[in-house]
Amino acid sequence: MTSPCTLIRQFSPLEIRPLPHLDFQAGFNGIPTSAPRLVGIVQVRSKEIHQPLALVQITLELWKIESVVIPSLGISNHLSDNKCLARQVLFPLHSEHPENNIPPNDNNYSISDLSIKSPPPSLTSDWIVDSYASDQDNPSVHTHNRTTPPIPPPHLPNASGSSVYQPPYTPFRSVSTTSSSNDTSITPFGDQTPILSSSSDPYATHRVWSMDLPFEIPFPENSEIPSTFELNRSGTICSTKYELRAHMSLLGVPDITTTVPVSLSRYDNLSSWGMYNSPTNIRQVSSDGRVVVEVSIPKLCIGPSDLVSVFVSIMPNNGSKIRVQQLSLSLVEYITFIHPSSSSPIVRKKKVLRYEEDLDDMKLTSEGLSKSLSKPFPDIDFEDANITGFTTTSDLYSVQYMLVIKVQLYRARNIEITNPIIVSPVERSRSQALLNEIQTRVLDVRQSHGGVVLEENVRIVRASDFSKNNMFAYLNDDIVLLS
């Protein structure tokens, strides 16, 4: 039988985990009515059998990490931007540490449109920490039920009445006792570097063996959080990544920090949305007025394995003896960078799909000419066909796509028609299934006053719960006494 010491050493003192069988992202980013958010659990475990943890504070932060590499810019070709989008004090109360309300002098922390603001007092749960430090005889594991739904019904106004965005969520858990109450909040501020916690106040530290702290970070309705993205095209690299960082402050020792990557997706650019499947008609006359071209684009959003298709109609206007030489269809990728040393944006473009049809100087009669052009996406004729991006916009860069139709004529000016098109990372079959899931989620949010996802309990094993020198071990991530 494995000894308890061996079992304990397999655990990290601080871990961030998603809910069982789920991802960190709940709801659908880009669809505000689905109440998108990040949910999970921060687990704290003591690795010493006879020494509980002397905790001062546990915080959780959501970071966005952007990076851009532009080879042709020389020594200043690399740009990066790291931002803390949200900071939540999980333990103890946020109000017991007012210094955390002071923004640090650090450019990495910025109050941007993506920052998740602190909830109004009227929507804040009460949380009591005095019970964690009491020496009264209590059960070895304390559970605090979460009884308040995380967001109010969508039809209710913001309780704060403020013009500044306030997330419609009640933070995370509710604990009620006869003691005084304080607020738990989310703030875009945080301590950048680990510090030595040297407080001698006995009420500022809490001796515990283990804790399970559920968290829930809502996404703002009035801001766009881009998808996780990474693209390397001909040496030009742009990426957006996210990670959760948990910091545990202990008495007299450096902070312990753990990070976990988080993959975020947006669902407002699915190719199955009806707004992207209405035909778009474009009419253009050649610069000499001799030919009229009409183009019909059946769908304005494409995904992997989709067929990019257009219908082209060419009619003579006031010319004769006009011949059509070639029709072509192209999809061009535009990567736009915002560089501090450049007065204008830097644009890199590359064709990612091309289809040509030679008509061998076909005569344009009075009845005109109609053709259909189509090709699967991505185009396997390109060497980097396996490198596919999608439409996205971030702080340092944006990736957009343009559909280009060219008509090459003889005895008339050539015509070129361009129209923006959205490229989605999701296949159309999967997109349709996601629409059904989104609809179900939105109905759940409306009917359950927020579609509660986080139903976990706060679980705390305090040092005072072991009156004797009992040994303990972990079983299925729960601490248990050994007989």
From Swiss-Prot:
Q: Which Gene3D superfamilies match?
A: 2.60.40.640
**Compartments (UniProt record):** Cytoplasm
Q: Does the keyword Cytoplasm apply?
A: yes
Question: What's the protein here called?
Answer: Arrestin family protein 1
Q: Which organism is it from?
A: Schizosaccharomyces pombe (strain 972 / ATCC 24843) (Fission yeast)
Ranges in coiled-coil conformation: none
Its encoding gene is what? art1
Q: What is its main location?
A: cytoplasm
Q: InterPro entries, alphabetically?
A: Arrestin-like_C, Arrestin_C-like, Cytokinesis_Signaling_Reg
